[in-house]
């Protein structure tokens, strides 16, 4: 039993978990209090008293004092409360015994420790109890010593058998076994070469790390510094400053005066406010430029006395990211404890969408934890706090860190810090606007290297040279840095062949767009790094084996940066598997498949940057230096295109085979990081999305938006009806397609009930998984709105309950006021649409006149001529059923050169027409016309608009009838919904008001291109 003293603020004495400092007597003498830099010794009171200056340097978490001390002693007129009482301290110690029941598992190997087997326990504080207490972590003897062997040098180890509580009860065999392990551990520790002693370092106010002992050096790792999901390493070019300057050599830090007001968080906040208030991006850049040149005083004579790198870094929290493991609800939860306020009130205010504003409001209202009177925090202290917070994972530790910084903040200070944690300062400005204020080439240099500190140092170095020699100004070089991700070059949507030919007058490489995951591969000797499209490390199970094949594929490559795509490929067919199969569980389901790297570009090779080389040279270089390894490392399929007809053929092929699309690249184009100078062709882009997959879904619920859409419903839960279970299923969440005016109108028009994701308020009619519990729910789905949802394709998502069917990249393209829940897409129809979308598309893209200066002739099959416009003799034959269209051409000027498909599951919209013959790029499929072919020349009219037909599945030729009826804008109803039908084929006993028709009537309407009287 040890006597402990706990020091607290008087205003917080009621909350014993607040700031505390514990001192322990040694041989009835107190330790020197002066060793704590934030505390000082004063007049004695009961043997020991402390006077607080700022805050305690040691904060013990709740649960470490056991039991809680109860006696309080006050020192009148001071800022200190003294709490005394006996408490048992949890120390790191070990025990040993025999497993009693065989239920405990080894903490290291995770296997059960068999009953009667000797085990070693490590006594640790119990993190699961508010009242404190100890718990034991059990290990096998061998596992315990393996763990200690790999532990840090400062970790307490077992050095003698007597340190194990209960060792006296052991058998001799176990004693000998443990003694042998202790001896082995000691010998290995003695044999390990000792590193140079690392001296305790201190962080100065300028952010530099210095050694307190003269002559002692601060030991830094030579490995690349990992930050924000990527590694930063020294570039090989001697012109550049080191990527990670050694402490004390940073030009930015050396120019900084930590006591100047330019370093205050208050001035940083003012800068952010000025940038946010100005809508002009040029003005935003100028404001930041003036601050970095003139400082907070605004005079050139004074200049900027702050840390340029740190200021720019904090201005870009969404670009230079750290992970803090805190979401909005967790932040509210922690601050509700700190402010001692109602968490439900804070959660309600959070619905407005800005957690930083919520924290500011409740901080100002807090009586037990009021804000500081004046803002004295510096950005160096804020940066140190953020670095510390990023290392914390336990909730109590995070709360203590937030409480420490909040005690020194004004309300607006804390608001700014929360926004830094959330990676959004709400200035409506990106990296380009901030970095352009630093140097005209800073943004391009940053995109290429992603090393902000290196870019800032080079800018300051250039400015320093200009001061010495005004005529020697050099432009900032843009170059890649090995082992640091390069911002990938991107592609813009291409909606027509004509646009592609115009954008690439030199010719283009047409490349298969694989539906996998973009990966940037960095190799430096035997070290490999893999980065995703968002510059984050790729999961190891997707890329770990490539280190065995890349050296074989590039036998002469010591260092390189490759741009590539990773996907799973079937070893039997050689075809890629669908998107999403790279997941660790889904990949296991494909036993006969390999993860393959499709390489399409090389931007760095053996210390030479290739970004400035034209694509034709980079591609040739890649072929000269790479050897394909089948189904492991392969070239992406690429074809040089100079004629529109060749491009049309490739578009036909990729969509017919179910591939994602094409990427078109100018043969003379350089690699431009972050720029959308490539083109991508996908079926949902063609002809303004006419080829995209579409479904009419019901709005079932809604979610609060974020940022500018905070406090309003801006994300909507879409679903469909399942007639079998008579429940509603979720299909997708849709956030796109509505402009601001429409969103504002929907807030009033949509009838919603707020449930705040409460599971108890989820209605019984809704089949939904927990992750999609909405903030709002419709009271009656049969009265809810129906929207046309368009996406890139139908996809599989087990999280959704519509038989796992979802929509990829959904957007609302139309509010269907003309439809209700009965006429919306139901689950059986959705399944059919999904299956149809996976079938080969029933269309073709045909290029225009061969003599055209910008296009080439079609290389497709053009047999015969289009049939006459006269009526046909009968229903279509099976041979012609797949050719639903004859020569079709775009009509509107906006879609000249586009692609007009008539997929069998996506009928044309009312009012749509096809183009006149004069269009330079024609669309359609020319096939030999037959007498039996229905009249489909030039257009699929909306013949059956408004007709709701019940078509019994037993009807002869049911599938073809259904297909053509839907293609000409008819609506089919299910048997349970026959009451809503306007026409019935067969027996109309269940709906005597409907008109009775026959299959001949359907064909006759198609031939005459209008509704005729039922026959």
UniProtKB/Swiss-Prot annotation:
Name the UniProt record assigns to this protein: DNA ligase 3
Keyword terms, alphabetized: ATP-binding, Cell cycle, Cell division, DNA damage, DNA recombination, DNA repair, DNA replication, Ligase, Magnesium, Metal-binding, Nucleotide-binding, Nucleus, Phosphoprotein, Zinc, Zinc-finger
Cofactor(s) needed for function: Mg(2+)
Binding site for ATP: 511, 518, 533, 665, 676, 680
Enzyme Commission number(s) from the entry: 6.5.1.1
Organism listed in the record: Mus musculus
Taxon lineage: Eukaryota, Metazoa, Chordata, Craniata, Vertebrata
Domain note: The PARP-type zinc finger is required for DNA ligase activity.
Binding site for Mg(2+) 2: 660
Binding site for Mg(2+) 1: 565
Region described as Disordered: 229-255, 849-926
UniProt GO cellular component terms: condensed nuclear chromosome; mitochondrion; synaptonemal complex
Distribution of this protein across tissues and organs: The alpha isoform is expressed in all tissues, while the beta isoform is expressed only in the testis.
């Amino acid at each position: 039993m040890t006597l402990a003293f706990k020091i607290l603020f008087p205003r917080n004495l009621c909350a014993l978990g607040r700031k505390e400092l514990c001192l322990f007597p040694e041989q009835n003498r107190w330790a020197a209090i002066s060793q704590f830099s934030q505390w000082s010794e004063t007049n004695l009171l009961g043997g020991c008293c402390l006077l607080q200056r700022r805050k305690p340097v040691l904060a013990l978490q709740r649960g470490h004092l056991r039991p809680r001390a109860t006696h309080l002693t006050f020192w009148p007129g001071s800022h200190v409360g003294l709490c005394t009482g006996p408490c048992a301290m949890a120390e790191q110690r070990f025990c040993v015994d025999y497993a009693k029941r065989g239920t405990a598992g080894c903490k290291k190997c995770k296997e059960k420790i068999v009953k009667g087997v000797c085990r070693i326990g490590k006594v640790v504080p119990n993190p699961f109890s508010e009242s404190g207490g100890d718990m034991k972590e059990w290990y096998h003897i061998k596992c315990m010593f393996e763990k200690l062997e790999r532990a840090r040098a400062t970790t307490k180890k077992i050095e003698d058998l007597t340190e194990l509580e209960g060792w006296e009860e052991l058998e001799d065999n176990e004693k000998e076994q443990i003694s042998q392990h202790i001896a082995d551990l000691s010998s290995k520790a003695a044999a390990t070469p000792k590193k140079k002693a690392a001296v305790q370092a201190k962080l100065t106010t300028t952010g530099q790390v210095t050694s307190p002992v003269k002559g002692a050096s601060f030991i830094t790792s030579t490995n690349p510094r990992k930050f924000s999901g990527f590694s930063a390493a020294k570039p090989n070019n001697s012109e550049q400053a080191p990527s990670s300057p050694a402490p004390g050599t940073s030009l930015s830090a050396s120019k900084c005066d930590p006591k100047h007001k330019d370093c205050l968080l208050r001035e940083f906040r003012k800068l952010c406010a000025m940038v946010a208030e100005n809508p002009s991006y040029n003005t935003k850049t100028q404001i930041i430029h003036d601050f970095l040149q003139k400082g907070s005083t605004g005079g050139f004579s004074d200049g900027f006395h702050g840390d340029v790198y740190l200021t720019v870094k904090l201005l870009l929290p969404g670009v230079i990211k750290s992970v803090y493991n805190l979401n909005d609800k967790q932040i509210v939860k922690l601050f509700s404890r700190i402010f001692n306020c109602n968490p439900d009130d804070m959660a309600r205010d959070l619905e407005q969408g800005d957690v930083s504003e919520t924290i500011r409001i409740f901080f100002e209202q807090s009586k037990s934890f009021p804000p500081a009177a004046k803002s004295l925090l510096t950005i160096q202290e804020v940066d140190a706090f953020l670095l510390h917070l990023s290392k914390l994972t336990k909730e109590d530790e995070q709360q203590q860190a937030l409480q420490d910084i909040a005690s020194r903040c004004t309300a607006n200070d804390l608001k700014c810090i929360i926004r830094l944690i959330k990676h959004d300062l709400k200035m409506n400005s990106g990296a380009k606007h901030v970095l352009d204020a630093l140097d005209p080439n800073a943004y391009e240099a940053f995109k290429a290297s992603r090393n902000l500190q290196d870019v800032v140092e080079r800018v300051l170095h250039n400015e320093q040279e200009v001061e010495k020699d005004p005529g020697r100004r050099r432009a900032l070089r843009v170059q890649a840095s090995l082992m640091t991700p390069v911002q990938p070059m991107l592609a813009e949507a291409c909606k027509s062949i004509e646009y592609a030919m115009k954008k690439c007058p030199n010719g283009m490489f047409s490349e298969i767009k694989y539906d996998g995951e973009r990966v940037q591969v960095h190799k430096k000797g035997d070290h490999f790094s893999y980065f995703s499209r968002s510059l984050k490390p790729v999961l190891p199970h997707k890329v770990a084996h490539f280190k065995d094949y890349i050296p074989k594929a590039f036998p002469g490559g010591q260092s390189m940066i490759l741009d590539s795509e990773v996907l799973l490929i079937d070893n039997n067919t050689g075809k890629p598997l669908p998107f999403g199969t790279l997941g660790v569980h889904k990949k296991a389901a494909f036993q006969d498949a390999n993860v393959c790297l499709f390489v399409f570009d090389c931007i760095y090779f053996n210390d030479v940057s290739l970004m400035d080389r034209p694509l034709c040279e980079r591609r040739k270089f890649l072929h000269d230096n790479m050897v394909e390894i089948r189904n492991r490392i392969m070239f992406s399929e690429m074809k040089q295109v100079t004629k529109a007809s060749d491009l049309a053929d490739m578009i036909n092929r990729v969509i017919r085979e179910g591939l994602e699309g094409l990427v078109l690249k100018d043969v003379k184009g350089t690699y431009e990081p972050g720029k959308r100078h490539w083109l991508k062709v996908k079926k949902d882009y063609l002809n303004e999305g006419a080829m995209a997959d579409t479904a009419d879904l019901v709005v079932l619920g809604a979610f609060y938006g974020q940022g500018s859409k905070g406090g309003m419903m801006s994300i909507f839960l879409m679903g469909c009806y399942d007639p079998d279970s008579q429940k509603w299923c979720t299909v997708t969440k849709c956030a796109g397609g509505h402009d601001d005016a429409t969103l504002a109108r929907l807030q009033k028009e949509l009838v919603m009930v707020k449930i705040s994701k409460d599971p108890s308020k989820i209605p019984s009619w809704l089949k939904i998984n927990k992750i999609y519990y909405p903030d709002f729910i419709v009271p009656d789905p049969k009265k809810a709105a129906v929207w046309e949802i368009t996406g890139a394709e139908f996809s599989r998502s087990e999280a959704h309950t519509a038989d796992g069917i979802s929509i990829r990249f959904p957007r609302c393209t139309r509010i269907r006021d003309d439809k209700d829940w009965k006429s919306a897409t139901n689950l059986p129809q959705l399944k059919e649409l999904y299956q149809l979308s996976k079938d080969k598309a029933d269309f073709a893209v045909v290029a225009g006149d061969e003599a055209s200066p910008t296009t080439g002739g079609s290389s497709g099959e053009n047999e015969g001529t289009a049939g006459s416009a006269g009526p046909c003799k009968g229903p279509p034959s099976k041979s012609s059923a797949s050719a639903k269209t004859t020569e079709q051409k775009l009509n509107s000027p906006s879609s000249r050169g586009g692609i007009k498909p008539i997929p069998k599951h996506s009928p044309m919209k009312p009012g749509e027409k096809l183009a006149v013959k004069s269009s330079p790029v024609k669309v359609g499929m020319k096939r030999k016309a037959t007498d039996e072919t229905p009249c489909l020349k030039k257009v699929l009219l909306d013949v059956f608009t408004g007709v709701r037909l019940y078509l019994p599945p037993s009807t002869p030729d049911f599938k073809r009838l259904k297909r053509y009826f839907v293609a000409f804008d008819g609506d089919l109803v299910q048997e349970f919904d026959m009451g809503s039908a306007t026409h019935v084929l067969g027996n109309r006993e269940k709906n005597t008001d409907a008109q009775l028709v026959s299959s001949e009537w359907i064909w006759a309407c198609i031939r005459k291109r209008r509704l005729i009287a039922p026959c």
